[in-house]
């Protein structure tokens, strides 16, 4: 079965677009990264762990031992007809402590690197098979940032709301051009993760970033 799955995989070729809207060559997406079966259970596990690790875990409530006051018995033990009480700071009283409330804790989960990488490959493959992976030479022409130009360019690529843009760390022109656009999230190739890929409707790579991601995970590189 594994051999059949491997033989069914194939490299995908997509066009590379320039900021002027013209096609500037094409790139090949290696099958080992962009055409693997999507393991939904694995992706769910990895995303759950990633989101759990992002929690601060600083929540804290006061138990009856932490709340001030309540040292005196509110009324005598017998003869009142009421239930016996030893303190006004027990959970059933207003202003009392919280029973079984949250305390500071670490929510992070240990996830093996191979599982994280496999989940990312599955997420990217799902996007690639549905035509949701795009490649561009750059987001804006020249070295002057332009949010208007970047917005217009992205609109020619996709009309969907959530877009993940993957560009190099040194591409400050691109970062400044799209960082204020609603629905656009920016990552560098080494920050690419399953959660952000699945959250995005489309993933837009610069050729430089695509080269970097493929080089870090295979022995191949693409050229536009």
UniProtKB/Swiss-Prot annotation:
Q: Where is this region: Disordered?
A: 52-109
Keyword tags: Ribonucleoprotein, Ribosomal protein, RNA-binding, rRNA-binding
Question: What's in the GO CC field?
Answer: ribonucleoprotein complex; ribosome
Task: Return one GO MF term.
Answer: structural constituent of ribosome
Q: Which SUPFAM superfamilies match?
A: Ribosomal protein L4 (SSF52166)
Gene3D superfamilies in the cross-refs: 3.40.1370.10
Q: Give the matching Pfam families.
A: Ribosomal_L4
Q: One biological-process term from Gene Ontology? A: translation
Q: Which family does it belong to?
A: Belongs to the universal ribosomal protein uL4 family.
Q: Supply the PANTHER family for this chain.
A: 50S RIBOSOMAL PROTEIN L4, LARGE RIBOSOMAL SUBUNIT PROTEIN UL4M
What role does this protein play? Answer: One of the primary rRNA binding proteins, this protein initially binds near the 5'-end of the 23S rRNA. It is important during the early stages of 50S assembly. It makes multiple contacts with different domains of the 23S rRNA in the assembled 50S subunit and ribosome.
Relate the assembly described in the record.
Part of the 50S ribosomal subunit.
- The identity of this protein, by name, is Large ribosomal subunit protein uL4
Naturally occurring in which organism (per UniProt): Mycobacterium ulcerans (strain Agy99)
- Please name the gene that encodes this protein: rplD
């Amino acid at each position: 079965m594994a051999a059949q799955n491997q033989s069914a995989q194939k490299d995908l070729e997509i066009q590379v677009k320039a900021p002027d809207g013209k096609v500037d060559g094409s790139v090949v997406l290696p099958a080992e990264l962009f055409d693997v079966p999507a393991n939904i259970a694995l992706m769910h596990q990895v995303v759950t762990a990633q989101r759990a690790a992002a929690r601060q875990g600083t929540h804290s409530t006061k138990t009856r031992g932490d709340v001030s006051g309540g040292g005196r018995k509110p009324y005598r033990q017998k003869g009142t007809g009421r239930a016996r009480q030893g303190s006004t700071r027990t959970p059933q009283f207003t202003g009392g402590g919280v029973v079984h409330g949250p305390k500071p804790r670490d929510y992070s989960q240990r996830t093996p690197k191979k599982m994280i990488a496999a989940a990312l490959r599955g997420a990217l493959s799902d996007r690639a098979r549905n035509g949701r992976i795009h490649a561009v030479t750059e987001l804006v022409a020249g070295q002057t940032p332009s949010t208007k130009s970047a917005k217009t360019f992205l609109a020619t690529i996709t009309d969907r709301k959530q877009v993940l843009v993957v560009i190099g760390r040194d591409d400050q022109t691109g970062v400044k051009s799209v960082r204020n656009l609603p629905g656009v999230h920016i990552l560098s190739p080494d920050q690419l993760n399953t959660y952000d890929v699945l959250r995005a409707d489309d993933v837009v790579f610069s050729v430089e970033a695509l080269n970097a991601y493929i080089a870090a995970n295979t022995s191949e590189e693409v050229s536009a």
